[in-house]
């Protein structure tokens, strides 16, 4: 696939950086982050500014353009993809490698003295702004807000912002009403003497009001802001979508509710003016809560003396701890998902030897089987369907130019998931339809040992996710191997497939302790550039663990796998497993057989059931 030609776009952007219509004084550098005004990871087409300018469309990356340079920072998931998608105008900055400068240090090294660095304040997170501004200031430069987004000025066919209908969720799915959620939030606000809370993250707003949307592909969210006071609720949302009868009834808009639960509906774009007006009337002691990941524009609308920033909002933390209705829904969703994947893998085993299955047709088939399941809404992210060398591109998405045919000679990796009304799934399986090489089996077995080490871990209550990351890497490290991504991320309940504040990563940002009810992924991998990729991913639920003793009465936790899809034993060097690891695998496969087998039977999917039974035969080491 040829990289995007960007010379003319960069020329126009540099011209805009000097245009007095957009900037009071010329700027010498312009920063283009990945996100939108809500700092979302996955964004609508109208917000894909970095991809438009550079050609690189991965979910994480920051572009910086100066008069002479164009540089792109991204992480290890996207090194190969970014290198292929960008032309030679761009320098790829590989984050996490010791020779790669930070964005701030690079700017200081290339900018002329006293430079002005511009950025759209609605898109830049507050914590990023503070860090960048401090370094630039100490080097004699200035970070300046540019209120007109310069990319929008040169993007002549920029798509419209979506404004799609809303979906209401009942108590069967949510377990708790939106009024109760607001009441719980207000209790937390009162504990901290907070008068107002500004909600900017789209998944937090969707969760708070038990609403879902489809404004962002694969993410059931809708463009909005919310402000919650101790006696007031404001929802900033465009279109007439709250006027739909079901939504009106759900939000109780027609009822003469007591004032504290009456929702004022306001235009989406009025958030800054309304927030400034609200802050103008604050008494000296009143505080306004906002995430430090909210945009700089939103934070700056709140006077410093009244602003109370936090890394994780109370909604973010409450949303991460699933209640019993949400946990049960996630279990149901994963059983349905397993049925679809059993169908897929049975189909692949029959069709791949015939030579007509491609990465794209396999991904399409996975979606076809998922669509047959009850309450299917959408995929949860674009399917990563990759064979042979494409598997080494961690977040690869097949397109016609790169679409390989699955064969009996290559490792196949599929990372896929779905949004069902009762839950969100994310699962990766790696398989071989012929005979894997000894080296492929060796690497797969190291990854499996890491996967089991995390899944079977028992750890004290209060443990933070980053402390478990080395469990997943230990077998790889022993052989001098590793992978350049985190081991796990939080998963929403019919919400975003990636959510905070919990995760399992070598980066210590996974700083919220794991607690019962949180749902994360367990997904170690290994990638051999130009050859193959291996990843084994389950979604797991944090649950209390039964232990012989209970030190200091603190309790212990472990994981319950929600994903119930067989792990291909053909890829395993069984003799390299310990007895304990064999026991874990056999127990896991027995659960897959019992739980998913029952559902396959009830849906009359006999061939897939036979495949499941074959794939869950016990394994044993040769002693």
Curated annotation (Swiss-Prot):
Record-linked CDD domains: APP
EC class, as a word, reads hydrolase
- Cellular compartment(s): Cytoplasm, Cytosol
**PROSITE patterns, sorted:** PROLINE_PEPTIDASE
Q: Reaction(s) catalyzed by this protein?
A: Release of any N-terminal amino acid, including proline, that is linked to proline, even from a dipeptide or tripeptide
Gene3D superfamilies from the xrefs?
Creatinase/methionine aminopeptidase superfamily, Creatinase/prolidase N-terminal domain
Give EC number(s), comma-separated.
3.4.11.9
Q: Could you say which residues bind Mn(2+) 2 here?
A: 426, 489, 523, 537
A cellular component annotation (GO) from this entry: cytosol
Please share the entry's free-text remark on the cofactor: Binds 2 manganese ions per subunit.
InterPro entries xref list: Creatin/AminoP/Spt16_N, Creatinase/aminopeptidase-like, Creatinase_N, Pept_M24, Pept_M24B, Peptidase_M24_C, Peptidase_M24B_aminopep-P_CS, X-Pro_aminopeptidase_P
Arranged from A to Z, the UniProt key words for this protein are: Acetylation, Aminopeptidase, Cytoplasm, Hydrolase, Manganese, Metal-binding, Metalloprotease, Protease
Q: Which SUPFAM superfamilies match?
A: Creatinase/aminopeptidase, Creatinase/prolidase N-terminal domain
In the record, what terms sit under GO molecular function? Answer: aminopeptidase activity; manganese ion binding; metalloaminopeptidase activity; protein homodimerization activity
Q: Which residues carry this modification: N6-acetyllysine?
A: 304
User: Which residues of the sequence carry a binding annotation for Mn(2+) 1?
Assistant: 415, 426, 537
**Which residue windows are transmembrane per the record?**
none
**Required cofactor names:** Mn(2+)
Give binding positions for a peptide: 77, 395, 489, 498, 523
> Which GO terms are recorded in the biological process aspect for this UniProt protein?
bradykinin catabolic process; negative regulation of programmed cell death; proteolysis
The job of this chain, per UniProt, is described as:
Metalloaminopeptidase that catalyzes the removal of a penultimate prolyl residue from the N-termini of peptides, such as Arg-Pro-Pro. Contributes to the degradation of bradykinin.
In which family does this protein belong, per the annotation?
Belongs to the peptidase M24B family.
Subunit-structure text: Homodimer.
Q: What protein is this chain from? A: Xaa-Pro aminopeptidase 1
């Amino acid at each position: 696939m040829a990289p995007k030609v960007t010379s003319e776009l960069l020329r126009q952007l540099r011209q805009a950086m000097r245009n007095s219509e957009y900037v009071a004084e010329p700027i010498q550098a312009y920063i283009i982050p990945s996100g939108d005004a809500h700092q979302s990871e996955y964004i609508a087409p109208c917000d894909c500014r970095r991809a438009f300018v550079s050609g690189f469309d991965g979910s994480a990356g920051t572009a910086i353009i100066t008069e002479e340079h164009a540089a792109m920072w991204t992480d290890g998931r996207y090194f190969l993809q970014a290198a292929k998608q960008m032309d030679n105008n761009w320098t790829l900055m590989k984050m996490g490698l010791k020779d790669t400068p930070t964005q701030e240090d690079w700017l200081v090294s290339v900018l002329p003295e006293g430079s002005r660095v511009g950025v759209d304040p609605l898109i830049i997170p507050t914590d990023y702004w503070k860090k960048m501004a401090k370094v630039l200031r100490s080097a004699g430069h200035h970070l300046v807000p540019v209120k007109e987004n310069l990319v929008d000025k040169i993007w002549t066919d920029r798509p419209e912002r979506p404004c799609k209908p809303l979906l209401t969720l009942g108590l069967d799915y949510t377990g708790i009403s939106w009024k109760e959620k607001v009441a719980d939030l207000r209790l937390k606000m009162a504990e901290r003497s907070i008068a107002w809370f500004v909600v900017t993250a789209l998944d937090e707003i969707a969760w708070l009001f038990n609403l879902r949307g489809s404004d962002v592909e694969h993410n059931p969210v809708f463009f909005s802001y919310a402000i919650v006071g101790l006696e007031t609720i404001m929802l900033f949302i465009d279109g007439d979508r709250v006027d739909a009868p079901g939504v009106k009834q759900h939000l109780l808009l027609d009822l003469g509710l007591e004032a504290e639960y009456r929702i004022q509906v306001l235009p989406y774009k009025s958030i800054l003016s309304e927030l400034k007006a609200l802050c103008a009337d604050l008494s000296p002691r009143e505080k306004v809560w906002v995430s430090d990941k909210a945009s700089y524009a939103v934070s700056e609308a709140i006077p410093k003396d009244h602003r109370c920033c936090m890394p994780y909002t109370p909604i973010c933390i409450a949303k991460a701890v699933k209640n019993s209705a949400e946990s049960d829904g996630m279990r149901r969703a994963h059983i349905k998902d397993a049925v679809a994947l059993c169908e897929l893998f049975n189909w692949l085993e029959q069709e791949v030897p015939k030579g007509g299955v491609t990465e794209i047709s396999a991904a399409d088939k996975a979606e076809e089987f998922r669509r047959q399941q009850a309450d299917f809404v959408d995929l949860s992210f674009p399917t990563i369907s990759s064979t042979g060398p494409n598997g080494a591109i961690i977040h690869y998405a097949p397109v016609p130019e790169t679409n390989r045919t699955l064969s009996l000679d290559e490792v196949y990796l599929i990372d896929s998931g779905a949004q069902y009304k009762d839950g969100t799934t994310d699962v990766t399986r790696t398989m071989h339809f012929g005979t894997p090489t000894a080296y492929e089996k060796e690497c797969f077995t190291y990854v499996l040992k890491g996967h089991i080490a995390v899944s079977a871990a028992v750890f004290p209550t209060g443990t933070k996710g980053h402390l478990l990351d080395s469990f997943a890497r230990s077998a790889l490290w022993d052989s001098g191997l590793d992978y350049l991504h985190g081991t796990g991320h939080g998963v929403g309940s019919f919400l975003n497939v990636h959510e905070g504040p919990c995760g399992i990563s070598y980066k210590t940002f996974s700083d919220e302790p794991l607690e019962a009810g949180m749902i994360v992924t367990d997904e170690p991998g290994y990638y051999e550039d130009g050859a193959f990729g291996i990843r084994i991913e389950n979604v797991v639920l944090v649950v209390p663990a039964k232990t012989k003793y209970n030190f200091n009465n603190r309790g212990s936790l472990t994981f319950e796998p929600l994903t119930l899809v067989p792990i291909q034993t053909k890829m395993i060097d069984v003799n390299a497993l310990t007895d304990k690891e064999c026991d874990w695998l056999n127990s896991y496969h027995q659960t897959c057989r019992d739980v998913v087998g029952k559902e396959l039977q009830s849906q009359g999917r006999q061939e897939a059931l036979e495949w499941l039974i074959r794939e869950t035969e016990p394994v044993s080491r040769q002693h």
